[in-house]
Amino acid sequence: ANDTFYNLSRNSLAHQGSYLLPLLQYFANTDLSKLKAETDDVYVNLPLIKMVSYPFSWILPMLILVTLLFLFLIFYGLHKRKLSGKVMAKGFVPFLLSLNLCGIMGFFGWKLMLVLYPQYLEIQQGFTYNGHWYIAFFVFLSLAITFAIYNKFTNKFNEPSYYVAPLLFWLLINLAVFIVLKGAAFFIIPVFFGLVSFFVMLRQERPSLLAMVFLAAPALFIFAPLIQFFPVGLGLKMLVISCVFTVLLFALLWPVFGYYKLKGLLSVVCILFATFFFIKAHFKSDFSAERKKPNSLIYYKDADIDKTYWLTYDKEIDAWTQQYLGERPEDASKILGEASY
């Protein structure tokens, strides 16, 4: 078995302990009958500042403020002739095309992996031993597609106009968050910084790359971890979300990437990285002594007929499950009927 003390990460254990010990100290000295909070808060971790929190009552005012700032900057850019209505409309083409193509690639790409490597179906929790290599593969492939599309559909001196579509889409995302998932309202923070970048782009012909990177930092620190966390936490079928978030993050970082002259070359570089990560994943795709094949074994009793069975989710029966199920186990649906799951 892999779940042994020797495989335990000491850093991971210390990390979990850093969560637990403050809670023990807090609750040990707190009246447990008075724990109910009057308000709900939004929480987000940021570098240097660490934990940032604010009440749910701030979400709508912040959303309204960001929307008004966005509209003001649009009118300001049009008035100063820094924005073009035609180019702003064209800016939706590379953005939506990248978003849709990468989403489709992420969804069907993982289904293709399951066809090429059927042994992955044996892993019930959905995250394979080489899962991190697949995340890297799909992320770099998404970047390659996005760089190639933006290289094809954008031109110089109109960088601010191409930033309107991503900002509008992020506003719509935050509107959906306000309605459906208020705990994720911290998504608005990188949009604030994006609007500052947008203002700088309208004021300066060639903004400082260092300043743009600084303003892009909140988006990187908040959204980049989510690209990995969704597949790790929910299984590799969520690679589609990683691909979509990669495009959304790329678009939010347009003030940095937009002024790159060699987007086509960067696309090729990303393809090379994607190829490397796919090859790496391929050589770690089989089960081995270090990457053991997982087994499932379920004890099932039909109380109506007072009969018991051994069942499994495994697609391939190995020596261990065979000793319980026999050499030719029958399909469990014949036993479970409508109770199968």
Predicted regions located by residue number:
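Alpha-helical transmembrane segments of integral membrane proteins
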Residues: 69-341
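Short, surface-exposed, charge-dense and proline/glycine-enriched linear segments
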Residues: 2-3, 27, 32, 59-75, ...
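Cytosolic-side membrane-insertion boundary helix
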Residues: 35-67, 84-88, 132-133
